[in-house]
Amino acid sequence: MNNMKKYIPILMIPVLLVSCKKDFLDKQPHEFTDAVFWKTAAQAESALAGVYTPLQDEEALGGEEWCSIETFGDNAYMNDNYSDYIAMSEFRALQNNEGDLSHNSYVSYYKTIKRATDVLTNVPGISMDAAQKKRILGEANFLLGFSYYELAARYGGLPIYDSKDPAAALVRKTEAETWAVIETTLKNATTQLAWEHEEGRPGLGAAWGMLAKVYAYEKKWSDAKTAAETVISSGKHSLTTSYADIFTIQHENDAEILFGLGARLGEYPITPVLMLPNNVWGGTHPEPMGEGWRLVSATVNLYNAYQVGDLRKKATVAKRGVDVITYNGSTDILQAPNNQSPIVCVKYNAPYKDEYTGWAAGLNVPALRYADVLLIDAEAIMNLNGGGPTTRTTTVAAATIPFNLVRRRAGLATIAAPTFNDLMYERRMELAFEGGDRHFDLVRWGLAESIYNALPAEGTYKPARTFIPTRHRLLPYPQGEIDNSNGSIKQNPNY
């Protein structure tokens, strides 16, 4: 009993319920008890809005941890601060004592999990319009599956929240059991959501797209292909013409965005400023660029890996003393004197080109894009036709169409019969700095050891690393959660 009292404040935080305004993400939180709540359609909508809120926490989607997870791969590094997190990203840590980024993001995702589960438990009993109820349940299922996915990719097996069984919060399911829950939850969402949806909310494309990514993790290639091609054949989604435009406020709700978490100007997200260099801390609009936290920056390895003519390079990275950037109305050569590497991520700089508007620029977080789904489709086709991580040079002509849609948009020549090596390149360059896909890809492909361990040190900011698959395939589980459970929750292997 004492164990439960210690753990409940973290995993079973009361649902935040919010009043109605025009923007469902701008509502103010209020708490209600089940005795007076879960009675009307308005309350159901209010509860659903509360499910989204934790994803906008500082360390959650688009926040510090979401940006910093990129440093586990070979695309990025952390400039300073958060020594415990840096130790994990350099595969030196034997414990996860990082109480800010890692643990706080874990808590934020579990807040969403708890609130989504409450919606799924209570909304079915409300007398309301059937179509509205179906949509609410679909969004809750998507957000539940999405949050579990983000955590499972990091930590493996998870406690599965059950409002009827509080003790379940103290026991981790196996990885297979956890992925099965995610799969089932997203399948439910595919039966409840519609292709048409409001901005900032998931639709049917998001549900099928996330399901395709889950199947790829599980190596269920036929299922991954079917899920991805359900999105493709719908005709509801397409690539934005210019890659750079995707990361602008003007195009943040394009058909390419399957799920983009809505922004609150002046409040959320802080993604752009986390990537901006810090030329003058506390200065007023220093030129030519820099009033950021310089939390995460790009590696020389990434900068040099772009193929000649790849338009994604200019839209993603810039080199000190070489590349011209526009910031706060001025165009000049990048300086970034305080960056440890000469490379800066400029992917989210667009809101600041004309004017620096504060740390929260109002740019939606691109949580899932159509390009990702196209590349999952190509990957599934390759694995079904002799290509894959162990046959990386095998050509697979059947993957040409989805593969080349992405490659052509980047300004590169099409490849008639792409290989898995070609796919690896496209996924790296297409999805850089979008929540750690590079690292998660290399891990699920079983290639992290060979690629990471072969990389030389890049200054002191990105040292040579030793990735041990039996340990580093998963991050160490947050020590705070283990302690709060009095050891009922177990650490990942070999930590």
Model-based region annotation:
Residues S19-K21, A76-N81, Y109-T112, V181, ...:
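Long, intrinsically disordered, low-complexity segments
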Residues K21-S83, K187-T190, R201-Q335, Y452, ...:
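An aromatic- and glycine-enriched ligand-binding surface/loop that stacks and positions planar moieties
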Residues E45-E59, Y82-R154, R172, A176, ...:
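Conserved, well-structured interaction surfaces
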Residues M1-P29:
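Bacterial Sec-dependent N-terminal signal peptides
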Residues Y82, A87-E98, N304-Y370:
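Flexible, polar/acidic helix-loop-strand segments at domain edges
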